[in-house]
Amino acid sequence: MRSICFNYINRLILLVALALTAAVGQAQLLRTSYFMESAHYRMQLNPAMTPSRGYVHLPAISNIGASYMSNGIGLADLIDIVKNSDEADYFVSNAFMNRLKDNNHAIANAGTDIFAAGWWHGKSFMSLNIGVKVDGSLRAPKSLFSFMREMRGMSTIDYSNYERHIGNEELNVSAYTEIGFGYTREVNDRLSVGGRVKGLLGLGNAKLKVNKAIVKTNLEGLDPNYDWTHGDPAEVLRAKGTASIDVEADLESSIQGLNLLTNGKGYIDDLEFKVSKMGIAGAGAALDLGVAYRITGGLTLSAAVTDLGFIRWSKGSTTVAHANTSDLHFDTEDEGDLMRFADIVNNTQPLNGDLLRLRIDEQAAKARTTSLSSSIVAGVEYAVNHDKLRLGALYSHHNDPVKAQDEITFSVNLHPSSLVDVAVSYSPICCGGQSVGVALKAGPLFIGTDYIYTGKNTKCCNALFGLSIPLGKASKSN
């Protein structure tokens, strides 16, 4: 019988999936907006890139979006993995396997503003924001899904000398509230510098890392194409020999109100979440810094680093667990022993809780510190026709626990009037040269994407929709 243990891991995967696909897209993901003069969303990328006018966000209908990016796992594939059932068979598809890379990762950085406003005061621009952000990422090597196919009997296996390594999996999710104050100063007609100081209130953080997972068998008399999920158990009982599972994995969770429950053997097999006890699990701070310099009348260089910060999670909200597979050695001389092995390897979940056997380590629980996923951008733009046409190129680097992302975005921006700003972009790296973006700012309305949706199994897609009220008059320098 499948252990309930996996339910906890599956919920963590679901939480990451929500971070990747829920309606949250934060402006820092929308590179297409970077050279749009009237779009205040670009300040999330560089606090020195001020909008032409102040603004007030409309609560609940501003900064609504979604974002997903992966090098190998398509959006539809991710949904199949997350909603995985006992009879899941997505991994038996050759098309699915052909889409995968040797090392697959999926990354998202998302958030929404509860309140945000910005305004000009002379040559200074100031802003306030209160928002919620979620960072999520996962890593899953192709060997993991190859192992699942082997256990379905899709490969000819010599079980008398079988060894499969399926480690190097990782899952991260972090949610926090951000309270920020930004200040930008036009030092002169050429130079602008800006910064944003942010206080962070941690809502929750979880990290699961599988360093190694090794499955070995020395079994005689077993069909080389035996299906451990649907095969006849009598065939397993006729086999002779030994098998073993060796895992190194760690789980760190800092969420107020979450209790991990264990079975009689001390392994996590369920969770209890009390909404009444949900609260602040940690606190921290972060800093954004940016600069923009106009070299000539039309040529401007800019650069920024954002989300330089940390969150310190409290000891009282933290639970630590480690894999304990010391007793996962099986011998057909012991009655029913090999059936225990079968119950583990026939699990069709990509992160198999029966295999990990996570045991809470109360002595290891302590306050812990995590870093934010910081970003670096550097841009160059050339404006002509009284700034009504802008040509831009933006380099961006985003740090993430599972994979750093680099991208170059080329854009053409049209600004025919103070009410309308349009941009079209092309980003050649992350999505194999198939990423065209577009953004529109028309009065209070903003809508944009870096990756126009190309189908249900796209590997890169995002969208951002927002409504804001213009505040004050346009800066004289814009």
Residue ranges of predicted features:
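Bacterial Sec-dependent N-terminal signal peptides
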Residues: M1-R31, V380
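Subset of outer-membrane beta-barrel
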Residues: Q28-N478
